[in-house]
Amino acid sequence: MHHLSIDLETYSSVPIAKAGAQKYISSPDFEILLFAYSVDGAPVEIIDLARGEHLPPWLVQAITSPEYIKHAYNAPFEWGCLSKFLGTLPPDQWRCTMFHGLYCGYTAGLDATGKALGLAEDKRKLNTGKALIRYFCVPCAPTKANGGRTRNLPQHDTDKWELFKEYCRQDVVTEMEIERRLSAFPVPDFVQKQWETDLIINARGVAVDMDLVSGALYLGNVTRQDLTQEAMKISKLDNPNSVAQLTQWLQEAMGEELADLRKDTVARLLGKEDNSPQVQRMLEIRQELGKTSTKKYDAIEAAVCPDGRVRGLLQFYGANRTGRWAGRLVQVQNLPRTYTEPLPLARELVEHRKLDALRLIYGSVPDTLSQLIRTAFVAPEGHVLIDADFSAIEARVISWLAGEQWRLEVFRTHGKIYEASASQMFGVPIELIKKGNPEYALRQKGKVAELALGYQGSTGALINMGALDMGIPEEDLPDIVSRWREANKRIRDLWYSMDNAAVQVITQGGSVGVNGLLLAREYDYNQGTDCFTILLPSGRKLYYVSPGIGENQWGNPSISYMGMDQKTKRWKRIETYGGKLVENCVQAIARDCLADTIERLEAAGLPVIFHIHDEVVIDIAPWADEDTMLDTVVNIMRQPIPWAADLPLNADGWVGTFFKKD
């Protein structure tokens, strides 16, 4: 078996960041400028396609041959580029070094990963690349100085072109060095297969209703203009969208100081009974304008390919620590819920730009448009969407992992975990916790406890989950925490067992088993790589780079590792603890359940077009009635997972022509 490492530099007039790689590649003016490669670690060669050089026949054959494993950093891009010219290349011949780095706990980005691994200067990515990419890879503005051209070619600056070739060559050097450094921690074959399936799903894409999208963009713009004009008329402000101007106006009109105009502040002010009609309406307009964003519709419009499908919505292994997928472009993992009825009529009114009718029937136009974003994803003519999602997957997984038997029994029977939790916490028969009984009020406490407390959260977690907004007095929160922990002793014990085991393996080395998980300290002495790992029941590992033990604010041992800070986006030392490690494992196991299920669905000829944590969406020509089709999918999702045969899974869903939250 040979190994072919590749890096391409390309040109397209389509902006890749907004439109995604598939639309970028599908542009008629797309071309590959440079092709850098190395075979079996030999010195890197470069082919200058932009200046007339050609790939030798043996290299073209190698790209399509199963005798050559192709490596690239962000391999889906190189795979997509070459597939445009050579036909769809077999995904199983490709390996992605960026994914390998993410699997091993590092960050994305060739430069960032090289620095995190401590690569020597001669092995790192050159820092001249961004300016060169801006010069050669994207259109340029026509000026008098450049003769009015809209694109820079090699002959326009030969010195820069030679630098660009060196930059491309060095990217292969860096990619190979990263792969060499990670080779002691290989990606399991079954996870590699999941990456290959993901490549196919992302390339398959999802159809979108562009009449709905364009109608929503039009109505959103008209509504925004109407609201702004009304606000200007009431307030006499030049720009009522200005927070500073509106704050000053409200302070003068209300006679009180305002710290901000955030969503919750506006909602609180709207609840005041002594507001003047003008103040009340200005606050309502402010609230409405906060919902008029059409960014997701803009994102769909920017990313839709010529065939009416959006591709590249998910990044495999995009979520740090857990290995879950991350949303890209339209962010399908963060779409507003749909509760407006009837949805088909709302969609029709938006498609035909019937603003007055939409407002008359549904009230708030911005809120309706926000909900309809989901429904922009559709089945093409002659097809249907089959949507199915796991029921309470994280609650089931943590119960199974901890061995909390009463919870497992709930999931094997009626599944009413909120009622059952309240029953356990307050010693009330579950039969009494139903609508119409005074005991039903306990369900709310059981629900917020279930949502907030599974990963060692306390009163702060309850507040963040909305306990106070539900009307639960703050003084009741400590009691809810203690009751939930007492009712879930095995889950509570799991937090502390994980914390103790992690401290032990980080300080002493070796490995410790906890409830079917194997925690270990792993080294590659040759490369100086040091990781704390957790082997999951599936056989996948979670990696924590350069682990250490410090002291937290309470004087207890504090577990830390190097990772990407989600707020600052910097590679830094991050603290963790037992409950957080449990959360990582539970979400990772839930992710593995989904990944296994996707493989089964694909094998059954049910093509997945995208998925969201615990939910899959299939686009297919109907082969039976709706109930039969849904049962087929749901039964596959309910099948026991081979490595978690006693984990009780359940699923439900719907069949329709557009995406929604049922």
What spans do the regions from the language model cover?
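Helix N-cap motif at beta-to-alpha junctions
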Residues: 621-627
